[in-house]
């Protein structure tokens, strides 16, 4: 899947780096600690990565294949490749090694960056992010604490398995100028999300359904009096019990500040919890 509109994305990046250079643009939890990139940091890193790509022979005729979880390194590298004028492609990050190699062989990109896998493919040039970026002091990125309740924060816990997702995340992030946060891993997503308490979600329909299943698993079993009480509360929108239950679920999932949920223009049937949250937001 190609990532479109590189010129517009880069223009927005320059805009925010000039308008709010010291505001936090990206956050990512690494080894249990939150790291932050300001807009000026993002612009500088994209420039350094672009120089690194050129040194690796990347040009306007080149194509970069990316595969992995959405996090700052992946977004920065995508923007750097676009700034050089090359094309960015994404491959699902949940492919088996053989299937991934077959996809790369079929697409035949000039360069590839695949998280967590280090095979040497003879038909494409594998890139190393740290080598492209050059020396950097990780302490500069370390953010030991911040008060999330005072700012607008978008949240994504996806990867390149979300077809078209990278374009969505880049567009929503760069158009809004809000900070964007990512969990350390999929397994730690709920815990990390609760720490951030995001105001906006950038998730695929599949991930939204996963959250619906998580909510369902935490409710009482069907047929029990506790579940009948929950169902009654949901059916009576003005009851205090309904508000109590919803607030508890919101806090459990880290949605106590949620005010925006991205969705494609054409959507299938929505999970009940999503309908309820959207009703509250409206």
Question: Where are the regions that the model predicts?
Answer:
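Conserved AMP-binding/adenylate-forming
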Residues: 35, 51-94, 155-160, 241, 245-282
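Short helix-loop-beta connector
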Residues: 58-63, 148-151, 256-257
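Conserved AMP-binding/adenylation subdomain of ANL enzymes
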Residues: 139-153, 160-247, 276-278
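Conserved ATP-dependent adenylate/AMP-binding module captured primarily in the ANL superfamily
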Residues: 78, 89, 93-121, 137-155, ...
């Amino acid at each position: 899947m190609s990532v479109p509109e590189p010129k517009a994305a880069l223009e927005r990046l320059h805009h925010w780096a000039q308008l709010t250079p010291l505001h936090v643009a990206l956050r990512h939890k690494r080894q249990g600690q939150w790291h932050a990139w300001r807009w000026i940091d993002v612009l500088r890193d994209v420039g350094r990565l672009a120089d690194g790509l050129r040194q690796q022979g990347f040009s306007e005729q080149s194509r970069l294949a990316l595969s992995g979880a959405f996090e700052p390194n992946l977004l920065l590298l995508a923007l750097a490749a676009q700034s050089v004028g090359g094309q960015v492609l994404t491959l699902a990050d949940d492919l088996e090694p053989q299937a991934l190699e077959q996809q790369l062989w079929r697409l035949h990109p000039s360069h590839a960056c695949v998280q967590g896998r280090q095979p040497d493919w003879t038909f494409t040039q594998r890139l190393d992010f740290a080598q492209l970026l050059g020396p950097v002091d990780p302490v500069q990125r370390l953010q030991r604490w911040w008060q999330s309740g005072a700012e607008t924060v978008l949240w994504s816990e996806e990867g390149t398995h979300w077809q078209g997702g990278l374009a969505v995340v880049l567009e929503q992030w760069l158009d809004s100028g809000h900070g964007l946060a990512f969990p350390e891993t999929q397994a730690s997503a709920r815990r990390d999300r609760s720490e951030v308490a995001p105001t906006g979600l950038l998730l695929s329909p599949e991930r939204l359904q996963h959250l619906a299943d998580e909510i369902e698993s935490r409710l009482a079993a069907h047929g029990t009096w506790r579940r009948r009480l929950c169902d009654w509360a949901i059916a009576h929108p003005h009851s205090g019990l309904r508000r109590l239950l919803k607030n508890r679920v919101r806090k459990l999932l880290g949605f106590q500040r949620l005010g925006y949920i991205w969705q494609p223009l054409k959507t299938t049937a929505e999970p009940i919890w999503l309908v309820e949250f959207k009703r509250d937001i409206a």
